UniProtKB/Swiss-Prot annotation:
Cofactor descriptive note: Binds 1 zinc ion per subunit.
Cellular location(s): Cytoplasm
UniProt organism field: Vibrio vulnificus (strain YJ016)
GO CC field: cytoplasm
GO biological process, any: ribosomal small subunit biogenesis
Family label: Belongs to the TRAFAC class YlqF/YawG GTPase family. RsgA subfamily.
Keywords (A to Z) from UniProt: Cytoplasm, GTP-binding, Hydrolase, Metal-binding, Nucleotide-binding, Ribosome biogenesis, RNA-binding, rRNA-binding, Zinc
Signal peptide (residue range): none
GO molecular-function terms, A-Z: GTP binding; GTPase activity; metal ion binding; rRNA binding
Protein name as it appears in the record: Small ribosomal subunit biogenesis GTPase RsgA 2
Database matches in InterPro entries: G_CP_dom, P-loop_NTPase, Ribosome_biogen_GTPase_RsgA, RsgA_GTPase_dom
Enzymatic class: hydrolase
Residues bound to GTP: T146, K147, A148, D149, G198, S199, S200, G201, V202, G203, K204, S205, T206
């Protein structure tokens, strides 16, 4: 088995992560006249697809829907794009910078490994941000903490992450040690799709290489003076580990703004929303209002002030971006209507003359 999935060898649909959810979307005609493929790499020039018939390149075309690594697509007999199958899960973020757009990260993921190093990169608020994205996508999150040997506060930091949620899986590993990384094996069984997400240089590619048992992704060290990664993954790709799971290694993300993520934020900060139900006033802003159950929890030490402030921040961010996306979609809809009217008027003029 070629772990990097770069050869032209065929894979069974089960190996590629095929599930009943996708099978239910196919007709008899689809089975007879199309090839079922999964996108295993996404580059500027196009997509790399794997199927039971082998490996294919699919050029990006403006008429295609937006697609990314993890998507299932159907190709016709000429190996041309025919249809994108409905996604079981979808990881996305607001595109970096001021651009008003939602960027796909990966799709059809079963487990999201949220990777954070226990050196200067350690940041609980960033972990909560990733958890919100995972929960919005209905993907099981697992927090993977690396570089424990670089921090004298490693044990304290691990406990802090575990306290974010009683049901949250947290694993501290040495990314270079196969025995240590084997703690992730329960989520890496045959046919499952997992993805790594985290800042640049936290060890995502190193973890991938250790699971694969080979140097597949280019990696670089972290400078001790500023803890910044020097070499990072630049394109999304899928790899198959010996145990049979598919791993999506995403580029490091210097900026990760939430898109429409209200459900994810609510689930990540569930205890705050539960406390809010006990406030004296229904419109309580959890600031200085009398009878605020949230502020009372902060005062008695059962809720961290940092966590409340991050909840406020993520709520504002996702609400703003969601409304911005909605406005953009409405403008595009109106523009589409105008174009159709113009085409209709032109057709009428041709008919008249």
């Amino acid at each position: 088995m070629n772990n990097t999935m770069t050869s032209s060898q065929p894979y069974t649909l089960t190996q590629l992560g095929w599930k009943p959810f996708f099978q239910q979307q196919l007709t008899l005609e689809d089975y007879e006249n199309t090839q079922i493929c999964r996108i295993v790499a996404h580059h500027r020039s196009g997509y790399q697809l794997c199927s039971e018939q082998g490996r294919f390149h699919l050029a990006i075309h403006h008429a295609q829907p937006k697609m990314t690594v993890g998507d299932w697509v159907l190709l016709d007999e000429q190996q041309q794009f025919k249809r994108l199958l409905e996604r079981q899960s979808e990881l996305s973020r607001k595109a970096a910078g001021s651009k008003i757009a939602e960027q796909l990260i990966a799709t059809n993921v079963d487990t999201l490994f949220i990777v954070c190093s226990l050196n200067d990169d350690f940041n609980l608020s960033r972990i909560e941000r990733y958890l919100s994205i995972a929960k919005e996508a209905h993907i099981e999150p697992v927090v993977v903490l690396t570089k424990a040997d670089l921090s004298p506060q490693a044990e304290q930091n691990i406990t802090q992450v575990q306290q974010l949620s009683a049901t949250l899986w947290v694993e501290a590993v040495n990314a270079l040690d196969p025995a240590s990384v084997s703690a992730l094996q329960p989520w890496c069984t045959k046919g499952r799709t997992v993805a790594f997400i985290g800042s640049s240089g936290v060890g995502k590619s190193t973890l991938t290489n250790t699971l694969l048992g080979e140097e597949t992704q280019q990696t670089g060290g972290i400078r001790e003076d500023d803890s910044k990664g020097r070499h990072t993954t630049t394109a999304r790709s899928v790899h198959m580990i010996p145990d049979g799971a598919l791993i999506i290694d995403t580029p490091g993300m210097r900026e990760l703004q939430l898109a429409d993520c209200s459900e994810g934020v609510s689930e990540t900060f569930a205890e705050i929303e539960t406390l809010a139900q006990h406030c004296r006033f229904k419109d309580c802003q959890h600031q200085q209002e009398p009878g605020c159950a949230v502020q009372q929890a902060i005062n008695n030490g059962t809720l961290e002030a940092r966590r409340l402030q991050n909840y406020f921040k993520l709520q504002r961010e996702q609400a703003y971006n969601a409304s911005t996306f909605a406005e953009q979609r409405n403008r595009m809809k109106q523009f589409g209507k105008m174009c159709r009217h113009v085409q209709s008027d032109k057709q009428k003029l041709k008919t008249t003359y």
